[in-house]
Amino acid sequence: MLRKAISTARNFKYPLFNCERRFSYFDMFRSKRKFTSGILTEQLALKLDSELGYVKQVLDETLPKKGYEKALHSFIIHEDPSLNYISALKETAKERIRVTVPVYSSRKSYVQTKPITHSAENENGNETSDELVFFQHSIPAYVQLTNNHGTILCALILCKGMLHFDSISFQSPQNSQAFSSDLRLILQKSQKYTGRKTKHVPASIKSSLLEFLDEQGITVKFMKALISRSWRKENVSYKHWIHNIIGFILPSESSTTKKSDSQ
């Protein structure tokens, strides 16, 4: 381009450096940089908007199952937006029960397992996300039962419509820890003998323990309902996160996006 400009100046016998506005590579690169930045911002905004649309669709289509929600009625459910877990509490004169489900996304694992399909029909005719079904069978729930004689701690996993122990431990009253926001840490960091590894516990004992938990209200329906709430909370938090990113890169569009989402 510079060579062409010099040639043109010579042909018309006007010195290049006497032109009113000198040619500047800086100006060219600056305009190109602005143009490129605008394209990248637009591409990012489109991808975010597409992801936002998918998350909103899944949330709209996936409604809590009434049959499962009834299983939560005897518990007090805590869903503090600032905390990265959901807990269910029940207290009687003899014991305290706390079930905690962490909040995290299983999208990556789900995508690696099978392609995402937006919805599927469940047995009650309600719409439910395949991702939610995967989530229910991949995330553990941490159960803590405490009375005057000690604390039973266990992690439960749903598999093929049944509850299975991922870990089981017992702590005597003098070693029992106070109700913790993260029961995983209690299970993982205990330095005292709390029991054998789950795979070495006889199947008959594990079966009886599951029946005992069932009497306390910790059933398959209870677990599915609580984990579903965890899944929904993560997706709602993710939706707000996308809103924040869109508002950051497109400040003028953030108010419009929030209005459309609230409608």
Swiss-Prot record:
Transmembrane segments: none
InterPro entries, per the entry: MAM33, MAM33_sf
Signal in keyword set: no
GO cellular component assignments: mitochondrial matrix; mitochondrion
UniProt keyword list: Mitochondrion
Database matches in Gene3D superfamilies: Mitochondrial glycoprotein
Protein name: Uncharacterized protein C15D4.11c
UniProt keyword Aminoacyl-tRNA synthetase present: no
Subcellular location: Mitochondrion
Superkingdom, taxonomy of origin: Eukaryota
GO BP of this protein: cytosolic ribosome assembly; mitochondrial RNA processing
